[in-house]
Swiss-Prot record:
The keyword Lyase belongs to this UniProt entry's keyword annotation: no
Membrane topology: Multi-pass membrane protein
Organism: Ajellomyces capsulatus
Reactions catalysed according to its record: [(1->4)-N-acetyl-beta-D-glucosaminyl](n) + UDP-N-acetyl-alpha-D-glucosamine = [(1->4)-N-acetyl-beta-D-glucosaminyl](n+1) + UDP + H(+)
Gene name tied to this protein: CHS1
SS bonds (residue pairs): none
Protein name as it appears in the record: Chitin synthase 1
Keyword match Amino-acid biosynthesis: no
Molecular function per GO: chitin synthase activity
Compartment(s) of residence: Cell membrane
EC numbers, comma separated: 2.4.1.16
Recorded superkingdom: Eukaryota
Amino acid sequence: DFLFARTMIGVFKNIEYMCSRTNSKTWGKEAWKKIVVCVVSDGRAKINPRTRAVLAGLGVYQDGIAKQQVNGKDVTAHIYEYTTQIGMELKGNQVHLKPRSGVPVQMIFCLKEKNQKKINSHRWFFQAFGRVLDPNICVLLDAGTKPGRDSIYHLWRAFDLQPMCGGACGEIKAMLSHGKKLINPLIXA
């Protein structure tokens, strides 16, 4: 739940940043309507119960309605969608939900029935949601990765300025607690 929340807080801040770009032809006050946050979880039995509770608190998950079979056929995945106005904050390793003063966030949550690993989750994202949403760009983040407040905008801008660009990546910095230093410089490399 902590790692998931850290990532989502960063994503929410990026959406707010794009909405704050009032002089932009693409972004601005209504930018949140152009952005969909898709969360894919790998296996109903494997998802952390606290992460599931955070998703329920955001309004994008309902506990107890998922079934393994419908009309005698195995279910592959459970899909939930919601436009949330709930935010999060971290206090230590605790996740606290709170009303968002910022912009709404459109979310889709795909809870795969079986754990089929990360590459299968990526396939789900591109084949299932990519076809329906028809996005200009996609940004993939693992839970625990905290994007800077404008980093997703800069990734988008790289694609916007170079339409023939097929991929881009951002810089990842190690998050250290205040006052901590790495003693072994090889670990930092």
